[in-house]
């Protein structure tokens, strides 16, 4: 008898599988909840698309800053190249008279080489560590083949400047190629009427609007972008996926184009020998391994090497000293402009990385809407549909003091959320809380996938 009474009691409290305490939730109430939740989701979609426009504006602003910086780079490049040309001209003129003082410099060079080798190998063993034996043999050959005149005119500094110029040109070319590829995609994307409407136009999409109004707001049928994605007559119904997936695909393509080429950049920009600390040491290690020229940077630590730099040949050839002074002046100027160019290049790279970061934000901001669009294949009018509402009184598995709500976002998997019972079902905040939690879980799962 007790069992029978219990069954009767359960039957009285059940209706279509939805329960809440002693009062069943009717189909009409579930529909009202679904409508309230759908309104919240609709608002979040609008906010997401507003966010897309805001990020688009930031990308355009960053691009304007990039263009301005590029102009400054071009001016600095002209000054740098002018100084480099003057340096090479002075070097050529000096080489024509290198026989002067050759005997004095050669004698000093023979005393300079052992000190230079010892100082360099100590540095390499302490800082660079790997492959000291091979580097020592390579350095021996380099010093034997080098001339004291090359040392006297600071040939290592000239070679470093020319190599930096080559690397800087390469870095800028890579960044420009990267941006041009991404920019062509973004230009096509941002020219669509979806992005060109005024900010106050907050009407983007609603499941309750007519297909005609929806298509006229989002697409300019004359644009190439619209023609590419609208292979069907304008009067046909546009589903959510048809409208948003192409945007997402193009944003993803732009981000890939940007990142692919930025990854080709060196870990650090070329003009690092003027910097201090670990970066400088790593650069010297690299130069020593490459062709031993990094060792010449240690000439200040060897007395005989310093004496070579102090040799005065003006007695035998007054014009040579003047040429050397001109070389040193143009060399210092070239180093100054090369350093300035490198600083501007780093700023330019930061702008590029900012654009890449904004594209990533654009991707993340838009991806959940786009992924959600893949689920909107049915004719259901609700974004969010409430299927079950229960509490501890009706389901012992529900923790005390909580209301459990099972919902579906479009055709997605069921999502279960809990709401404190202090927020009653009649409270306007109830379904807002449910929808917010459901959307958070959906976004989280979408990111993990």
From Swiss-Prot:
One of the GO biological process terms: positive regulation of proteasomal ubiquitin-dependent protein catabolic process
Gene Ontology cellular component list: chromaffin granule; cytoplasm; cytosol; extracellular space; intracellular membrane-bounded organelle; mitochondrial inner membrane; mitochondrion; nucleus
Keyword annotations of the record: Chaperone, Cytoplasm, Cytoplasmic vesicle, Disulfide bond, Endoplasmic reticulum, Glycoprotein, Membrane, Microsome, Mitochondrion, Nucleus, Phosphoprotein, Secreted, Signal, Ubl conjugation
Disulphide-bonded residues: 101-313, 112-305, 115-302, 120-295, 128-285
Main location: secreted
Compartment(s): Secreted; Nucleus; Cytoplasm; Mitochondrion membrane
Motif Nuclear localization signal: where in chain: 77-80, 443-447
PTM annotation, UniProt: Proteolytically cleaved on its way through the secretory system, probably within the Golgi lumen. Proteolytic cleavage is not necessary for its chaperone activity. All non-secreted forms are not proteolytically cleaved. Chaperone activity of uncleaved forms is dependent on a non-reducing environment. Polyubiquitinated, leading to proteasomal degradation. Under cellular stress, the intracellular level of cleaved form is reduced due to proteasomal degradation.
GO molecular function: misfolded protein binding; ubiquitin protein ligase binding; unfolded protein binding
Entry-listed glycosylation sites: 85, 102, 144, 291, 328, 354, 374
Superkingdom of origin organism: Eukaryota
UniProt keyword annotation of Phosphoprotein present: yes
Membrane topology term: Peripheral membrane protein
Signal sequence interval, chain numbering: 1-21
InterPro entries found in the cross-reference section: Clusterin, Clusterin-like, Clusterin_C, Clusterin_CS, Clusterin_N
Modified residues (Phosphoserine): 132, 396
Free-text function comment from the UniProt entry: Functions as extracellular chaperone that prevents aggregation of non native proteins. Prevents stress-induced aggregation of blood plasma proteins. Inhibits formation of amyloid fibrils by APP, APOC2, B2M, CALCA, CSN3, SNCA and aggregation-prone LYZ variants (in vitro). Does not require ATP. Maintains partially unfolded proteins in a state appropriate for subsequent refolding by other chaperones, such as HSPA8/HSC70. Does not refold proteins by itself.
Subunit structure: Antiparallel disulfide-linked heterodimer of an alpha chain and a beta chain. Self-associates and forms higher oligomers. Interacts with a broad range of misfolded proteins, including APP, APOC2 and LYZ. Slightly acidic pH promotes interaction with misfolded proteins. Forms high-molecular weight oligomers upon interaction with misfolded proteins. Interacts with APOA1, LRP2, CLUAP1 and PON1. Interacts with the complement membrane attack complex. Interacts (via alpha chain) with XRCC6.
Protein family according to the UniProt entry: Belongs to the clusterin family.
Protein's UniProt name: Clusterin
Species of provenance: Equus caballus
Lineage per the UniProt record: Eukaryota, Metazoa, Chordata, Craniata, Vertebrata
Gene: CLU
């Amino acid at each position: 008898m007790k069992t029978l009474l219990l069954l009767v009691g359960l039957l009285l409290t059940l209706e279509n599988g939805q329960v809440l305490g002693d009062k069943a939730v009717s189909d009409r109430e579930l529909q009202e909840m679904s409508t309230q939740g759908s309104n919240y989701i609709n608002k979040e979609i609008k906010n997401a698309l507003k966010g897309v426009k805001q990020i688009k504006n930031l990308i355009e602003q960053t691009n304007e800053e990039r263009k301005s910086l590029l102009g400054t780079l071009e001016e600095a490049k002209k000054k740098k190249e002018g100084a480099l040309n003057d340096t090479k001209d002075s070097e050529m003129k000096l080489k024509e008279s290198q026989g002067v003082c050759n005997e004095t410099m050669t004698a000093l060079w023979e005393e300079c080489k052992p000190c230079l080798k010892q100082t360099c190998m100590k540095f390499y063993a302490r800082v660079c560590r790997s492959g000291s034996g091979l580097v020592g043999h390579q350095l021996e050959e380099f010093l034997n083949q080098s001339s004291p005149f090359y040392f006297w005119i600071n040939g290592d500094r000239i070679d470093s400047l020319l190599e930096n110029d080559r690397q800087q040109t390469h870095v800028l070319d890579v960044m420009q190629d990267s941006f041009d590829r991404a920019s062509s995609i973004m230009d096509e994307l941002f020219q669509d009427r979806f992005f060109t409407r005024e900010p106050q136009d907050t009407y983007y999409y609603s499941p309750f609007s007519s297909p005609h109004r929806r298509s006229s707001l989002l697409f300019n049928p004359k644009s190439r972008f619209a023609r590419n994605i609208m292979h069907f007559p304008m009067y046909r119904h546009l589903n959510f996926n048809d409208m948003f997936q192409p945007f997402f695909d193009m944003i993803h393509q732009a981000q890939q184009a940007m990142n692919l080429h930025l990854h080709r950049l060196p870990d650090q920009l070329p003009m690092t020998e003027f910097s201090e600390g670990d970066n400088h040491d790593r650069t010297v290690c690299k130069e020593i391994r490459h062709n031993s020229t990094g060792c010449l940077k240690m000439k200040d630590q060897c007395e005989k090497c310093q004496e070579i730099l102090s040799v005065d040949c003006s007695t035998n050839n007054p014009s040579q000293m003047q040429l050397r002074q001109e070389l040193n002046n143009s060399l210092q100027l070239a180093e100054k402009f090369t350093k300035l160019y490198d600083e501007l290049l780093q700023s330019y790279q930061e702008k590029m990385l900012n654009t890449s970061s904004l594209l990533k934000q654009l991707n993340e901001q838009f991806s959940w809407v786009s992924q959600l669009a893949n689920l909107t294949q049915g004719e259901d009018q609700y974004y969010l549909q409430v299927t079950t509402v229960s509490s501890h009184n009706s389901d012992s598995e529900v923790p005390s003091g909580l209301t459990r709500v099972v919902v579906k976002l479009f055709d997605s998997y069921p999502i279960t959320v809990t709401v404190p019972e202090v927020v009653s079902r009649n409270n306007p905040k109830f379904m807002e809380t449910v929808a917010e939690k459901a959307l958070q879980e959906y976004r989280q799962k979408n990111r993990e996938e």
